[in-house]
Amino acid sequence: MASSASLETMVPPACPRAGASPATSKTLAFSIERIMAKTSEPRAPFEPRPGALEADSGQGKKLLNLCSPLPCMIPLQPLGYEMPSKTLLSYSELWKSSLRAGGSGGGGGGGGGGGGAPVCGASGLCKTNCGVCCKAELGLVPSALPAGRVIKPQVINQAVGLPASGSLYYFNYLDSATYPSSELLGGHLFPSGLLNTQAPAALAAHPKLFLLENAKLAGLTADKFAHPAPYAHKERLPAPLEQVLKENSALTAERGGVKGHSKLPGGSADGKPKNFTCEVCGKVFNAHYNLTRHMPVHTGARPFVCKVCGKGFRQASTLCRHKIIHTQEKPHKCNQCGKAFNRSSTLNTHIRIHAGYKPFVCEFCGKGFHQKGNYKNHKLTHSGEKQYKCTICNKAFHQVYNLTFHMHTHNDKKPFTCATCGKGFCRNFDLKKHVRKLHDSVGPAAPSTKDLTRTVQS
């Protein structure tokens, strides 16, 4: 009691307010009643006081709604294009400009009550301060931004028909289920000239995508951007909007002289197909490299020759596949006869023999073949043309590899030798035929396939 009394004596008595009775005294700031009082609830989100942010639009004073839950996009500086003559205003400058502009900038909106967003009263294209009023209407204030999540910046393309093309935007998506109506999208955010007349109706089906009109605010024009960047967005747009963007892209490319890049097969950057025609047979190729690989068919050149058997090939890759024949590894075996092969493709061709399947039939004699290569070689026998001739004995052949094997008879090069009798052959086929006819009847003395291969390698 003494301590409390001393405290009261140290503090001067409170002065009575005007109009109050002298008996009523003011509660001390450090009184026990104030300290023990119940803590008040947290403060509500910021709401503008009536009259604090009023703008005279000519039709009476109307309040700007700063707490609208609408998503928005914050325009930044253009990326990778020519810098605009008039830079974007800072946040504080935009706010001050909105207060000074009043009704001239479309600040007057209707229906500030509740969570709805007022619609700009400006008719036609919004004026310079439209970006300001859009920010005010969409609730672009520090207290409203934490309610949404900021998505990675994306580049809006000049080819989609936007005057503010090439600008970098931050997409602010609110998790609230409240989205603007189609009237708001069509009447304010998409004025004439921003997109074509079909855009507002198409974009109404995708309420999360909003484009702020900052062309006049930044001083940007569509003719300043000559190189369009691809339209990027995390979410797939609805089909009507994609159709609208495609149409606008085609129109902008026509007007701006931007050449489209064709991604069709056989197409080039200028849209013209790449046709490389063979002058001999008229076959068409989509690349010059393929035409170069085709020409040895007519010239007969086989620069890639096997060092073991002397067989020539047009391509190095074919020679590499051929070299497997001379190795001992044959992992692919036939389940019916037990014959082993180096490649699985050769095994598949061999299985046709057991099945009796001969898909390649000669049109002249009706003979069938398991492989397409044998079918082509057989057709040359009906033509009677033997363009490959030996320079020593003038013997002619249908195929160039037959001439290559024939040349071994003149230089005594016979890489395939029989392990039983020691006879040499130019081709492995002739060696196998020799063993089958002469040595298979002997039985134990008949060499195996592995022995023949080892003889060739030695």
Swiss-Prot record:
Keywords: Developmental protein, Differentiation, DNA-binding, Metal-binding, Neurogenesis, Nucleus, Repeat, Repressor, Transcription, Transcription regulation, Zinc, Zinc-finger
Region annotation Disordered: where it falls in the sequence: 1-22
Engrailed homology 1 repressor, short sequence motif: residues: 26-41
Subcellular location: Nucleus
Any Pfam family matching the protein: zf-C2H2
ZnF C2H2-type: positions: 276-298, 304-326, 332-354, 360-382, 388-410, 416-439
A GO molecular-function descriptor: DNA-binding transcription factor activity, RNA polymerase II-specific
Tissue specificity statement from the Swiss-Prot or TrEMBL entry: Highly expressed in brain and weakly in the mammary gland. Infection enhances expression in the mammary gland and promotes expression of SEMA5A.
GO biological process: cell differentiation; nervous system development; regulation of DNA-templated transcription
Keyword Chaperone appears in the UniProt entry: no
One Gene Ontology cellular component annotation held by this UniProt entry: nucleus
Entry function: Transcription repressor. Binds to 5'GCAG-3' core sequence. Required for the specification of corticospinal motor neurons and other subcerebral projection neurons. May play a role in layer and neuronal subtype-specific patterning of subcortical projections and axonal fasciculation. Controls the development of dendritic arborization and spines of large layer V pyramidal neurons. May be responsible for mastitis resistance and innate immunity.
PANTHER family tied to this protein: ZINC FINGER PROTEIN, ZINC FINGER PROTEIN 771
Family: Belongs to the krueppel C2H2-type zinc-finger protein family.
Protein name, entry field: Fez family zinc finger protein 2
Gene symbol of the encoding locus: FEZF2
